[in-house]
Amino acid sequence: RRPPRSTPLYSSAASDVYKRQPIHLLINGDPDKKSFIVQPGHLSLVKHLNRPIEDPPKDSKTSWRRRQLAEYITHTDNPLTSRVIVNRIWQHLMGKGIVTTPNNFGFKSASPTHPELLDWLASEFVEGGWSMKKIIKMIVMSETYKQSSTHPNNMECTQIDPDNRLLWKRNIRRMDAEVLRDSLLQVSGDLNLKKGGESFYPSLAPEVLEGFSRKSSAWTPSPDKDQLRRSIYMISKRHLLIPFMKAFDFPSSEKPCGNRNRTTVVSQSLAMLNNQFIHSRSSNLARVLIQEHGEDEDAIFNAWKQIFSREPKPHELEASLKHYHKQQSYFSEKDNSRLLALSSVCHVLINSNEFLYID
C-alpha cells in the first residue's frame, strides 16, 4: 500500500566499510553450512583479465574493493565498457546500434556493421574523459546524423542495401512512448517542468484496475498538475503498465530491455484517436491558439508551427481550413463551435506521421 504523501521518502543504499568481512563458500547455498573462505578477485578464467585485489592504504576508511572493481571495468585494457556505452548512444540517436544486440557483446552477439567506426567512437569517448555530452555532440553534428530518410537514388540504393546497413539514409522511426507523451504535453503548453520529487500516479480508467482487490488503495491518482510532469517521473509498476504507454511499446520493468520492440498495431491508432489524454491536449492547444490569434487562418497557421515547427504549405493550409469549416458547421449548434472545430484540426495534426515519427 502506498504510504501517505506526507511520509518522508527513504531509499536503501549500500555502504562500504573498512573492516573486511570473511566470505565463505556456502554448501548448497545454505548460510548455515559454511566451507572455506573465498578471497575477492577478478575473472581468473581469462589470464590477462585476472588481477589481484590490493589492500587499501592504511589511512583508508573503506576496503577499496568497489573502487578497484570500478577501475577494473573502466580500465583502458578493457575494450568492452566504452564500446557498449557508445553503441547504446548510437542506438538512441540513430534508431539502430552498430551492434544490434546491445545487451550482448559476446561470441553469440551480432557482428558490428561498422567495426572501425565503433572502435573510433570508443577511443574518442575515452580520450574525451568519458563525456557523454561530447560524444553525443559529435554524432549529432555529423553528416550521417543529419541525413534525410529520403534519398535521390532511393530505388537504386534500396536494391543494393535494403536494410540500410551502410547508412546511406536516415532510419525513420516512431517516437518512444515517453517522448510521445512529453511532446504532446509540450505542444499543448501543458508540460510541467518541475524537477525531482516522488513519482506521480496518472488517472486510469476503472476497467484497468479490475484485477486489484483494493482498487481505491492500490492506485490513487496524483493531483492534475503533477500528472502533467515529464514521463520520467511517472510511476512504473511491474504488474501494471499504463495502457497508453504500453500501446506504444513501453517495456516491462520485470527484466532489462536493451532494445525496445517497435510495433505498428491498431491499438496505437485507437489510442491516438480516442484516448482522453489526447483529446485534452488538442483542446488545450486550440484554446491557446484562440486566445493568441483572432483570425481562424492565423490560428491554424500557428497550429502547424507549434506542432511541426514549420509553416504549412499552401495546399496544407487550404486542406486544414476546409476541415475546420466543415467541423465548425457540424458543431454550429454548440456555443463553443470554434473551439471544437479547431480542436479537431489539432487532433488531426498530432495524429499525422510527421508528428509521430522522427525523420
PLM-predicted stretches and their roles:
Residues 1-14:
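Positively charged, low-complexity/disordered segments
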Residues 12-223, 251-260, 273, 279-341:
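Primarily short, surface-exposed interaction patches in extracytoplasmic proteins
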Residues 235-238, 247-256:
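A structural supersecondary motif
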Residues 263-266:
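Terminal end segments
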Residues 345:
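Globin-like tetrapyrrole-binding proteins
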Residues 358-359:
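Short, solvent-exposed mixed-charge patches
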